[in-house]
Swiss-Prot record:
Protein name per its UniProtKB record: Small ribosomal subunit protein uS13
Subunit structure and binding partners: Part of the 30S ribosomal subunit. Forms a loose heterodimer with protein S19. Forms two bridges to the 50S subunit in the 70S ribosome.
UniProt xrefs under InterPro entries: Rbsml_uS13_C, Ribosomal_uS13, Ribosomal_uS13-like_H2TH, Ribosomal_uS13_bac-type, Ribosomal_uS13_CS
UniProt keyword rRNA-binding, yes or no: yes
Keywords: Ribonucleoprotein, Ribosomal protein, RNA-binding, rRNA-binding, tRNA-binding
Gene source species: Rhodococcus opacus (strain B4)
Gene from which this protein is expressed: rpsM
Keyword Protein biosynthesis: no
Length: 124
């Protein structure tokens, strides 16, 4: 099993897809990496030679911020926004959508499960 940036790549997937299992690499960046290193996107990760694997590892380590480093940077950016008290920081602190989405309905992912409020009871 090929291992890049601390992630085990799936053996049966094409390299173009397998690289997207690394946090910070999507389809477009995956294609860019494969073009720059000269590795065929149609190769399966189980068929990679050690030379190809070394090329990919070197390219990713030198020119990209992925996995742990990228996660730390994103968390640091969020913490900074919370500390300076900007609008986005307040939204992060309150657990609400940050990018202007509506909250009267929807926004359940950020707000969590519904809290039901007891309604008025009918008098007989």
């Amino acid at each position: 099993m090929a291992r890049l940036a601390g992630v085990d790549l799936p053996r049966e997937k094409r390299m173009e897809i397998a690289l997207t299992y690394i946090y910070g690499i999507g389809r477009t960046r995956s294609k860019e990496i494969l073009d720059a290193t000269g590795v065929s996107p149609d190769l399966r990760s189980k068929d990679l030679s050690d030379e190809d694997l070394a090329k990919l590892r070197e390219y990713i380590e030198e020119s990209l911020k992925v996995e742990g480093d990228l996660r730390r940077e994103v968390q640091a950016d969020i913490r900074r926004k919370i500390e300076i008290g900007c609008y986005q920081g307040l939204r992060h602190r309150r657990g609400l959508p940050v990018r202007g989405q509506r909250t009267k309905t929807n926004a359940r992912t950020r707000k969590g499960p519904k809290r039901t409020i007891a309604g008025k009871k009918k008098a007989k």
